[in-house]
Amino acid sequence: MSKTAVKDSATEKTKLSESEQHYFNSYDHYGIHEEMLQDTVRTLSYRNAIIQNKDLFKDKIVLDVGCGTGILSMFAAKHGAKHVIGVDMSSIIEMAKELVELNGFSDKITLLRGKLEDVHLPFPKVDIIISEWMGYFLLYESMMDTVLYARDHYLVEGGLIFPDKCSIHLAGLEDSQYKDEKLNYWQDVYGFDYSPFVPLVLHEPIVDTVERNNVNTTSDKLIEFDLNTVKISDLAFKSNFKLTAKRQDMINGIVTWFDIVFPAPKGKRPVEFSTGPHAPYTHWKQTIFYFPDDLDAETGDTIEGELVCSPNEKNNRDLNIKISYKFESNGIDGNSRSRKNEGSYLMH
């Protein structure tokens, strides 16, 4: 294969659902790619993982799922891959073609436009899959489904997936001022009662940066996925958690984040990164779920709960999330401060 080739899309966009069209169109503009490229935690982690495993990439066929501007494809080609196939549905792949040619990788990288399920790969099997598929709360936009499709249809037995391990974590947080501002605003809007908006506001998780000192409980690992073995059905999950208050404080909700781990040569520490409040900033930030009530916690009080996550029935790239919890408080007035409640949320 001697020429980078982007032909007409293998997928006819007009035949996609409106939500699918909106999703792919959102990646047409350079701005979203600029934000991802400038996320050095994200981009350098991929580069460093490829460099650490350059012996494994040498002379291998690599599939880049959702290649965007082609940065991961070029990392792989630069560090020894025999050939890289980049697949993307959005029009940004036209720019990727220009970038690949400009940087001298036309003979090593083939770009295909379309959904992975629709394109025809120039090789029957690949040795390595690379993909930056993660969304907010890890699973939002459900691109992991496509990576698993690539694994099941194209990856050789014993092939590698970069990254291959991921986990979702959560902790309690104090965020009274911001929560009050968001909710109290609707009590008096230019002299009118707009309080019916309050449940709608609570129903929507917030993606934002949480300061480390706002986290006021222990953390817990909600779930872990191994991309070598996980099934699409596993991505709809139910998981229990337990958190313990680390100080006397209000607990207004939970903050969630995810951790990522790449394969590593035997005896080497793997490249990994976290998107939590304790870690350097990433464009994924954190995802906040406000509780229906505020918990008045003393040191050692506990929250035990269950989080249920599933694709939304109208748009499977959105997520339905339900959090039920039991807050048990100690002390003289512990009974009056204890709570049992649940909240339902939609990430869209």
From Swiss-Prot:
Any single biological process term in GO = positive regulation of transcription elongation by RNA polymerase II
Q: What else is known?
A: Present with 37600 molecules/cell in log phase SD medium.
PROSITE patterns, alphabetized = SAM_MT_PRMT
Where S-adenosyl-L-methionine is bound, by residue? 33, 42, 66, 88, 117
What's the protein called, per UniProt?
Protein arginine N-methyltransferase 1
InterPro entries linked to this entry = Arg_MeTrfase, PRMT_dom, SAM-dependent_MTases_sf
Species name: Saccharomyces cerevisiae (strain ATCC 204508 / S288c)
Q: What quaternary structure, including any partners, is listed in this protein's UniProt entry?
A: Homodimer. The dimers can then associate to form a ring-shaped homohexamer. Interacts with NPL3, BRE5, MTR4, SNF2, SUM1, and SSD1.
Similarity-based family: Belongs to the class I-like SAM-binding methyltransferase superfamily. Protein arginine N-methyltransferase family.
* PANTHER family, alphabetized: PROTEIN ARGININE N-METHYLTRANSFERASE, PROTEIN ARGININE N-METHYLTRANSFERASE 3
The catalysed reaction is: L-arginyl-[protein] + S-adenosyl-L-methionine = N(omega)-methyl-L-arginyl-[protein] + S-adenosyl-L-homocysteine + H(+); L-arginyl-[protein] + 2 S-adenosyl-L-methionine = N(omega),N(omega)-dimethyl-L-arginyl-[protein] + 2 S-adenosyl-L-homocysteine + 2 H(+)
The UniProt entry's GO CC annotations, sorted and at most eight, read:
nucleus
- Which Gene3D superfamilies does this entry report, sorted A to Z? Hnrnp arginine n-methyltransferase1, Vaccinia Virus protein VP39
Protein's cellular compartments: Nucleus
Recorded GO molecular functions are: histone methyltransferase activity; identical protein binding; protein-arginine N-methyltransferase activity; protein-arginine omega-N asymmetric methyltransferase activity; protein-arginine omega-N monomethyltransferase activity
> Where does the record place the catalytic residues?
132, 141
Q: What effect on the protein does mutating residue 68 to A have, as reported in its record?
A: Reduces catalytic activity between 5- to 25-fold
Keywords of this entry: Methyltransferase, Nucleus, S-adenosyl-L-methionine, Transferase
Under SUPFAM superfamilies, the record lists:
S-adenosyl-L-methionine-dependent methyltransferases
Q: Where is the SAM-dependent MTase PRMT-type domain?
A: 20-322
Enzyme Commission designation: 2.1.1.319
Outcome when changing residue 68 to R: Abolishes catalytic activity
Q: Main role?
A: S-adenosyl-L-methionine-dependent protein-arginine N-methyltransferase that catalyzes both the mono- and asymmetric (type I) dimethylation of the guanidino nitrogens of arginine residues in a variety of RNA-binding proteins such as heterogeneous nuclear ribonucleoproteins (hnRNPs) and small nuclear ribonucleoproteins (snRNPs). Methylates NAB2, NPL3, HRP1 and YRA1, shuttling hnRNPs involved in mRNA processing and export, facilitating their export out of the nucleus.
